[in-house]
UniProtKB/Swiss-Prot annotation:
CC cofactor: Mg(2+)
Alphabetized GO MF terms: ATP binding; tRNA dimethylallyltransferase activity
Protein name: tRNA dimethylallyltransferase
Enzyme category, top tier: transferase
Amino acids binding substrate: 18-23
Chain sites annotated for binding ATP: 16-23
Biological role: Catalyzes the transfer of a dimethylallyl group onto the adenine at position 37 in tRNAs that read codons beginning with uridine, leading to the formation of N6-(dimethylallyl)adenosine (i(6)A).
Pfam families noted in UniProt: IPPT
Amino acid sequence: MMQNLARDIDAILITGPTASGKSALAVKLAQRHGGVVINADSMQVYGTLKVLTARPDQSEMGGVEHFLYGHIPPGRAYSTGVWLREAEALVARLGKEGRLPVFVGGTGLYFKALTGGLSDMPEIPLETRKRLRTRLTEEGAEALHGELSARDPETAGRVRPSDGQRIVRALEIIEATGRPIGSYQQSRGPVIIDPARAQKIVVLPERPVLHGRIDRRFETMLARGAVEEVRALLALRLPPEMPVMKAIGVPQIAAMLKGEMSEKQVIEAGAAATRQYAKRQMTWFRNQLDETWQRIEDPDALG
């Protein structure tokens, strides 16, 4: 089946948790089918933190052209909508050139938008985001859920009182536009990749295997320059609510630079945070990706 892939489909989509080996698989399949690799990870778009976000280096690219990696300054806002517009332009260009796009990354929402369209959500002012996230920290999710119940009872009924992120998102929309989030979710943009015309792969390694990779990877990141990356990032004095400032490893290494943590503690804390993130990713993939996604434990099985 894999040998005839390029003639039968319009794209390859590969997702999976961090450290699952999906990037190497993407390169291998792109090499085999004369394709290119397109990033679908929300952290790997930033021009900083190449090591901490495990952005592929030249030797790992295997001579395959890579797109949407490291092209966004760390202080610039970036959203799923922006990524989707960039991906759409690339897909159109590659189609004219007769080259196969191989999307790879761990941001599940990117794949949902790519194959199912994206609701036309409005941009939220940074000040509104900051204020509501501060309130979430200070008041807690249940208090904000009570406010959402009064302002948008329909959405509040669908959101758990403990789900702070979704509650804040719904309140952001109301405050920015005066309209409930549901009014935007009802309309969706165009589908960029027809899911019936794509080979869809999700890499789900066994937990002990994945955890071993994560532990080794974080220690290697420190040895390869992650501390210097964070030092340079902190020198930019970006607002703490910027996504790049929340990347796994940044808070831990920043604490070490302040003398608040040892290197050993940073490695342990960073690996633990990565394992938690991988757990959330795997839960999302299992719940959100349907049976048309090919589930594999070992990327080498597709060799």
